[in-house]
């Protein structure tokens, strides 16, 4: 006879009650159906719920599944939205679909919101094994956490210590109906192969193996937390660092501790960790490079560079070089969606003067630019050097041209020819990237 416990403990109810809105990832499968029913049956939480169904468009049954989910939410009196998502299907479909899901969930979360997912103990065990087979370190083997940050809100997995069999028992008792996705039987997908071919053999030999593997993940989570504390102790600059990091404090550390600091820095910037080989390259080719060297290490549209005594992290939208564009709707904001640049114009006490009917264009450095500044004609290249702007950033600094004359280097200088102290005429151009 199956000994059951409440799927949602009083501690979890108290924890979830503090949020303004609980967004439930609702696929219609067993896990999310039980999760939604449990939450809807818990009075302190039932009025906080929003069920979100992601339609991946992979199966021919997708629309039927969406209708099923919508009807169940209608029966339970729960707000429901569905979203069809697009993602790259040319490579790892599982990973691409997952990333697209989480991106959409993240976009929904506001301050004091929580995304609640139905992952259970068996899912955790599978995740640990998949990470192990990939040669993951402590971060990967820590697998899924019960609580973590996501976007502006939080992510919670209240069933992570519950075996799937307990969810099945709950579903039978409450006569719940759920979707069986036919793709879950396809063993060409790694997780399905593990679930249907490997786990049954392990469970036959060691019946409690899923719980033991999950417990190992908890140990790895504690080790991960300890390593993060050590990283901050080794490099206090991590507390303030965003896309740049001071090199000097870490040069005297052992190799493994430098790697630990770099991992913390990349995770803080939401960058997927590279291979051990890449960490070796960052340390040997960049951190210990000659002072005047400017090496680069790249992976997956990410770059780590060095300029003087700092490491710099560049993401894909910071690597793409923007093209010139006319600012026809000035002073409305101007956005470069693929280059992480958004310009806005705000009134100022002194600053840039825009003549009436002027032609305004945003350009970027190509070489040879000059600006009349502080009573002299100066080469932009020399000014960038004086301002100690990293070389790769120089090509991305917006240049405001008015009637084909360089009038403003955004964030740094306004040409004397276009400078005014008249508050009625003065503008400040701000790069909000």
UniProtKB/Swiss-Prot annotation:
GO biological process, one term: tRNA modification
Catalytic activity: cytidine(34) in tRNA(Ile2) + L-lysine + ATP = lysidine(34) in tRNA(Ile2) + AMP + diphosphate + H(+)
EC identifiers of the protein: 6.3.4.19
Single GO molecular function: ATP binding
Gene3D superfamilies: 1.20.59.20, HUPs
Location, primary (coarse class): cytoplasm
Subcellular localization(s) per the UniProt record: Cytoplasm
Protein name stated in the entry: tRNA(Ile)-lysidine synthase
Organism for this UniProt entry: Legionella pneumophila subsp. pneumophila (strain Philadelphia 1 / ATCC 33152 / DSM 7513)
Gene name of the encoded protein: tilS
């Amino acid at each position: 006879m199956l000994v059951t416990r409440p799927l949602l403990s009083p501690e979890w109810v108290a924890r979830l009650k503090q949020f303004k809105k609980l967004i439930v990832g609702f696929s219609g499968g067993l896990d999310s159906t039980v999760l939604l029913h449990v939450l809807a049956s818990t009075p302190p939480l039932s009025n906080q719920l929003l069920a979100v169904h992601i339609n991946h468009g992979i199966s021919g049954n997708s629309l039927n599944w969406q209708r099923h989910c919508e009807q169940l939410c209608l029966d339970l009196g729960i707000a429901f939205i569905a979203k069809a998502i697009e993602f790259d299907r040319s490579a790892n479909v599982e990973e691409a679909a997952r990333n697209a899901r989480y991106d959409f969930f993240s976009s929904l979360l506001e301050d004091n919101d929580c995304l609640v997912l139905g992952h259970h103990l068996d899912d955790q065990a599978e995740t640990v094994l998949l990470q192990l087979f990939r040669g993951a370190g402590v971060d990967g083997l820590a697998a899924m956490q019960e609580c973590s940050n996501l976007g502006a809100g939080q992510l919670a997995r209240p069933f992570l210590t519950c075996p799937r069999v307990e969810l099945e028992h709950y579903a039978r008792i409450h006569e719940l109906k759920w979707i069986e996705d036919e793709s879950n039987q396809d063993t060409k997908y790694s997780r399905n192969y593990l679930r249907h071919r490997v786990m049954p053999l392990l469970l036959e030999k060691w019946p409690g193996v899923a719980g033991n593997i999950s417990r190992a993940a908890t140990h790895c989570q504690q080790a991960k937390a300890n390593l993060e504390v050590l990283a901050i102790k080794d490099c206090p600059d991590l507390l303030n660092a965003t896309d740049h990091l001071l090199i000097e404090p870490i040069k005297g550390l052992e190799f493994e501790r430098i790697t630990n600091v770099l991992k913390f820095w990349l995770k803080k910037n939401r960058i997927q960790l590279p291979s051990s080989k890449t960490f070796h390259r960052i340390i040997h080719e960049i951190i210990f490079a000659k002072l005047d060297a400017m090496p680069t290490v790249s992976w997956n549209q990410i770059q780590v560079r060095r300029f003087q005594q700092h490491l710099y992290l560049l993401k894909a939208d910071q690597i793409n070089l923007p093209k010139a564009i006319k600012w026809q709707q000035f002073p409305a904001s101007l956005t470069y969606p693929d280059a992480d640049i958004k310009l806005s114009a705000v009134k100022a006490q002194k600053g840039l003067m825009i003549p009436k009917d002027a032609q305004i264009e945003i350009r970027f450095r190509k070489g040879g630019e000059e600006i009349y500044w502080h009573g002299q004609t100066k080469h932009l290249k020399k000014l960038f050097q004086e301002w100690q702007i990293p070389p790769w950033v120089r090509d991305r600094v917006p240049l405001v041209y008015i009637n084909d004359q360089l009038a403003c280097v955004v964030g740094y200088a306004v040409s004397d020819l276009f400078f005014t102290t008249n508050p009625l005429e003065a503008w400040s151009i701000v790069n909000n990237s």
